[in-house]
């Protein structure tokens, strides 16, 4: 009788352990990323799954979604359950912190202001550069039509807007009326305002809209050198001066703690700082921080003087309130351009 009880207890304990292990293995975490990161995380995610299994002995599943980072942030605020964010706009993470979804000091939780990699705004032009586009000044010409995403929904496009603003701010020695007029002309020349970066790429490279696509340097190089639009023979233009675009990452604490995914989520974001992933990021033409990788890829990137928007325009709260909130300068300039 005692033997039967012991065996039954062992069987129950084994079943419980198996169930708990299975539950832990099957608990997925959700990464919400920006619109043009599909191919990048299509590589990173399976590499992390393998890495996690080697480190922990457990399986992990990653649920992945893509959209303009501002749209992603709004969806999360409205109840979308996401464990980590890998965005292209710091303010889109800040707004989640303000809503109590993650900690206020999220940018201190990982190196380099929680930005494993960075980029800048560059231009893509038609074969032979028929409009002779060299820099920001060319974007206000009457004969030039532009394509970039809507800054109201896309972090990518906010950097395009800020790149134009920061260039004009230097050009006109801070004369705000002249700066506004310059950026207003840029916006007036926009032929198509898709909600996200991928839509802008398709509009320009596939549908033939516009003379210049403004997007991240990484995307510009990927489009020009990739197979998808190879027949179009598109060309890269990197202006001499442009905006520093940091790509922030964060754990959505409220969700990760509720679902018990913090350990996996933290490891996933730390993984992006590893040498192997930093090398992978440069293959997608992102600029990175790992010293050995930076040295090995110096020739890959065009020289450009990067302006940190926070050093000129203040905090992201200030920038968002002044430029991108409803009724801000962006809305004013768009209304004037209609």
Residue ranges and their predicted role:
Residues 18-20:
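N-terminal signal peptide c-region/cleavage motif recognized by signal peptidases
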Residues 79-85, 143-145, 207-215:
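Alpha-to-beta junction loops
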Residues 97-170:
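A conserved helix-loop-strand patch within extracytoplasmic ligand-binding domains
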Residues 256-338:
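Extracellular/periplasmic juxtamembrane helices and adjacent flexible linkers that interface
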